[in-house]
């Protein structure tokens, strides 16, 4: 597990490791150093994902024993690194940005997410846009993409 952890530590940005450590610590209510299925569901939602029960059970099965921080980091880094690249996500938003302002009407985005593709629920929508950069009804997809991918590049 130590070998796996060192690999994880080199491929994740330090900021993301720190965020995951803080999240893990918040979940480990009894401070025993381990997380269970309910804890995993809560942390997934904090990270912007809504896994189903089957996925959570599968994640716990990936750990050879009780889920401590090292195993947690290893498992979640695989899940997080399995997402699209920052550029891919930004380009997907850009397809709807006809004026090339790097901003989209937030109501338009919400309508797309509710009625097309994954059909987001109201709760999923709330979780997704809870900390999204929205000013004057305009959603800044460049900042949002940097935020969800952990690059922290706000000046793009």
From Swiss-Prot:
Please provide, in alphabetical order, the Gene Ontology terms of the cellular component aspect for this entry: myosin complex
What GO molecular function annotations does the UniProt record carry, in alphabetical order? Answer: calcium ion binding
SUPFAM superfamilies reported in the protein's UniProt record: EF-hand
Matching entries from InterPro entries are given as: EF-hand-dom_pair (IPR011992), EF_Hand_1_Ca_BS (IPR018247), EF_hand_dom (IPR002048), Myosin_RLC (IPR050403)
Residues that bind Ca(2+):
28, 30, 32, 39
Lineage, top-rank taxon, reads Eukaryota
The answer to whether UniProt assigns keyword Repeat to this entry is yes
Which PROSITE patterns does the record match to this protein?
A: EF_HAND_1, EF_HAND_2
Q: Where is the EF-hand domain?
A: 15-50, 84-119
What keywords were assigned to this record?
Answer: Calcium, Metal-binding, Motor protein, Muscle protein, Myosin, Repeat
Sites where Blocked amino end (Ala) occurs are at: 1
Q: What does this protein do?
A: In molluscan muscle, calcium regulation is associated with myosin rather than with actin. Muscle myosin contains two types of light chains: the catalytic light chain, essential for ATPase activity, and the regulatory light chain, a calcium-binding protein responsible for Ca(2+) dependent binding and Ca(2+) dependent Mg-ATPase activity.
Query: What is noted besides the main data?
Result: This chain binds calcium.
Q: What is this protein called?
A: Myosin regulatory light chain, striated adductor muscle
């Amino acid at each position: 597990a130590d070998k796996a952890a060192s690999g994880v530590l080199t491929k994740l940005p330090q900021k993301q490791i720190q965020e995951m450590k803080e999240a893990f610590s918040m979940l480990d209510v009894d401070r025993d150093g381990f997380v269970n299925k309910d804890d995993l569901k809560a942390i997934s939602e904090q990270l912007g994902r809504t896994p189903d029960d089957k996925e959570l059970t599968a994640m716990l099965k990936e750990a050879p024993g009780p889920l401590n921080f090292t195993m947690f980091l290893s498992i979640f880094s695989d899940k997080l690194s399995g997402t699209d690249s920052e550029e891919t996500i930004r380009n997907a938003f850009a397809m709807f940005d006809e004026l090339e302002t790097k901003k989209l009407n937030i109501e338009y985005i919400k309508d797309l997410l509710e009625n097309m593709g994954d059909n987001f629920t109201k709760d999923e929508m709330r979780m997704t846009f809870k900390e999204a950069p929205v000013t004057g009804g305009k959603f800044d997809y460049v900042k949002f993409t940097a935020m969800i991918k952990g690059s922290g590049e706000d000046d793009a």
